[in-house]
């Protein structure tokens, strides 16, 4: 006999997965009715972290493969860590998002503005299945479109959290 509560949870997960995936596709003009790039490589590992002078600016997002499957690790405010499974469809959507954001243009970015006393820093490391990658780091200096692209990455991981009924807006460091 199957557990009704478990069945309901699985239905909600698939509903949110499909909704998030369709929303991501609908918002990307490149994919609205178009086929994805044939040469677009799939993300193998991903790590993005950003920090600032306040705890609420400290976030870390990772995707990696383990023996038991692909996992996303989300760390917020140096206090909350969530480890969630990532499906093939979610990884494909994330790979498409990185391609759409043109994060490859950041590869090799290494800038620091040491004259700023307070500020923000970031680190990005992506490895793709085809062997290519992106490595970028900045302190008080950022590549073009940094805040918009950071927001898109954050939105992807927050959508993943919502699939598991975790509301990032209700999590605080206080």
Each predicted region: which residue ranges?
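Short, surface-exposed charged micro-motifs
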Residues: 58-62, 123
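Short, Lys/Arg-enriched N-terminal segments with co-localized hydrophobic residues
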Residues: 1-9
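Sec-dependent N-terminal signal peptides of Gram-positive bacterial secreted proteins and lipoproteins
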Residues: 13-32
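Tryptophan-centric aromatic hotspots in well-structured domains and transmembrane helices
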Residues: 57, 105-106
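Short, well-ordered, aromatic-rich surface patches in folded extracellular/luminal domains
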Residues: 33-53, 84, 97, 107-174
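Short, solvent-exposed coil/turn segments at beta-strand boundaries
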Residues: 62-69
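A short-motif feature that recognizes glycine-rich, charge-decorated loops
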Residues: 72-105
């Amino acid at each position: 006999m199957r557990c009704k509560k478990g069945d309901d949870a699985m239905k909600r997960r698939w509903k949110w997965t499909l909704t998030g995936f369709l929303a991501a596709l609908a918002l990307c003009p490149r994919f609205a009715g178009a086929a994805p790039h044939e040469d677009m490589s799939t993300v193998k590992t991903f790590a993005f972290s950003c920090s600032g002078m306040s705890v609420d600016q400290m976030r870390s997002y990772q995707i990696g493969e383990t023996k038991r499957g692909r996992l996303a690790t989300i760390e917020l405010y140096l206090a909350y860590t969530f480890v969630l499974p990532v499906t093939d469809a979610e990884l494909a959507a994330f790979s498409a998002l990185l391609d759409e954001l043109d994060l490859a243009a950041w590869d090799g970015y290494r800038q620091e503005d040491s004259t700023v006393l307070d500020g923000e820093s970031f680190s990005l490391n992506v490895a793709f299945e085809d062997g290519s990658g992106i490595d970028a780091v900045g302190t008080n200096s950022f590549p073009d479109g940094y805040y918009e692209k950071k927001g898109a990455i954050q939105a992807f991981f927050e959508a993943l959290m919502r699939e598991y009924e975790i509301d990032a807006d209700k999590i605080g460091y206080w």
